[in-house]
Amino acid sequence: LFELARDCGRRVELAVETKHPSRFGGAVEQALTDLMDWFGWLPTESNADPGPVRVMSFSGRALTRIRHRSPRVPLVYLVEKPTPAATRAGLPGHAATLGISVDLLGASDWLGRIGARGHGLHVWTVDDVGRIDDCLAAGATAIITNRPAEIRRHLATLTG
């Protein structure tokens, strides 16, 4: 996947989710940051570009491990339930973005509180164009879908 993104001739951003990383004691995060470094995509203090990879996880510990390896990698904390205790005081692992299921849109006002703190909002998996307005109303900064062409066409009709 990294090779395809590198070789496609234009910038492609990758959202990499670490699945159940806690079982491996940091090996997943180590391997991922090593791969990012090998491709030259591990952000450094001297490089203003955070790179094309953002890391997503349901594990705050995994995000903290990534943060320790490279403080500038964009991080997304994924949640499955509204108002998780972990997000009341901010996002774990120094994540700048909250990632939620499309089913959580409109669940309560907790998304507004997250946005008021300046955090981004990623919504997954949005395959129904009828949910786009909900995503935009919630302040989504990214929409994750299995139907990118269809979603892009719909977004184009909204922006003219």
Language-model features: locations:
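Short loop-to-alpha-helix "cap/lid" segments that border enzyme active sites
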Residues: L1-G160
